[in-house]
Amino acid sequence: MADATEKAEHDRIFKKFDANGDGKISAAELEEALKTLGSVTADDVKRMMAEIDTDGDGNISYQEFTDFAGANRGLMKDVAKIF
């Protein structure tokens, strides 16, 4: 379970990734966000989408994002430093 600080970080990062503010992260939005972290290929984006988009609807919901973030705390700390 994420504490309040961790939840606030997840909220902040999710909003940065969700460029159009529709409450979900599309593959295009994920690609743009990942470009901030360095070079990213279309295959990288596909792999990340496949891993995070657990319901397979083509978008990353807030719940899917927080589930991934909770399982990958070290990675999310690194992402939080950049965003």
Swiss-Prot record:
Gene3D superfamilies with a match to the protein in the record: EF-hand
GO molecular function: calcium ion binding
Keywords per UniProt: Calcium, Metal-binding, Repeat
Pfam families per UniProt: EF-hand_7
Binding-site list for Ca(2+) 1: 18, 20, 22, 24, 29
Binding site for Ca(2+) 2: 53, 55, 57, 59, 64
Domain EF-hand: 5-40, 43-75
GO cellular component, one term: cytoplasm
SMART domains with a match to the protein in the record: EFh
Function of the molecule: Potential calcium sensor.
Protein name as annotated: Probable calcium-binding protein CML29
Provenance organism: Arabidopsis thaliana
